[in-house]
Amino acid sequence: MPSKNSINRPKLTSNLHHKVHSLNKKRAQRERAGLLKPARSSVNSKSGEIKSVALDLYFQNKKNESQNSTAVTLQNASSSPASITTRTLSKKRAKKIERNLKYATQRKLLVDASAKLEDEMDIDLDGGKKVKENEKKSSLTLVKEALWSVIDDTASQGLIIENGQGTTLGGPFFP
């Protein structure tokens, strides 16, 4: 069979068929080995999720440390990690992650405390006014309130003007 660049080269479709066939074989082999990631439209796909490799490594190391520290049984030789990875987390990055997590918890505590304080302030203000009003109701304040309510009632009525027809003289006006 002549090469791709020769004068009497084969048709494009046969080249494409060969390429697609070889890619299909590679894909099937990777799928059998479990190395193929799910399609982006698949439910199992994590393509839209936010992922931080450093955070994953940090939490994985913390989980492993906690499991090792609480283990009471003897460790055997087969308890080594299942897979060897080249991804590691530096001490500097681990310290930075710890610091950021500490700041996040402090921010959360501050927000919770301020919300709690704000709720308490609302309750105290409402309850305090009612208690003070009930305590200071003497005869003098009752008389003052009664007098001011009478003054407010008379002032609120004001001058009542009836709407008549025509001009101010009372007769109809036609220009």
Curated annotation (Swiss-Prot):
Q: Which Pfam family is one of those matched by this entry?
A: Alb1
Cystines in this chain: none
Kindly list the GO CC terms recorded for this protein: cytoplasm; nucleus
Intracellular or extracellular location(s) = Cytoplasm; Nucleus
Composition bias of kind Polar residues appears in 1-15, 72-88
Report which residue ranges the record marks as coiled coil: none
Record InterPro entries: Ribosome_bgen_Alb1
* GO biological process terms, semicolon-separated: ribosomal large subunit biogenesis
On the tree of life, the source organism's domain of life is Eukaryota
Which keywords fit this entry according to its UniProt record?
A: Cytoplasm, Nucleus, Ribosome biogenesis, Transport
Disordered, as annotated region? 1-43, 72-91
* Miscellaneous comment text of the record: Present with 4780 molecules/cell in log phase SD medium.
Report the function annotation for this chain: With ARX1, involved in proper assembly of pre-ribosomal particles during the biogenesis of the 60S ribosomal subunit. Accompanies the pre-60S particles to the cytoplasm.
Q: Which family does it belong to?
A: Belongs to the ALB1 family.
* Subunit structure as annotated in this protein's UniProt entry: Component of the nucleoplasmic and cytoplasmic pre-60S ribosomal particles. Interacts directly with ARX1.
Protein name in UniProt: Ribosome biogenesis protein ALB1
Q: Which organism is it from?
A: Saccharomyces cerevisiae (strain ATCC 204508 / S288c)
Which taxonomic lineage is given here? Answer: Eukaryota, Fungi, Dikarya, Ascomycota, Saccharomycotina
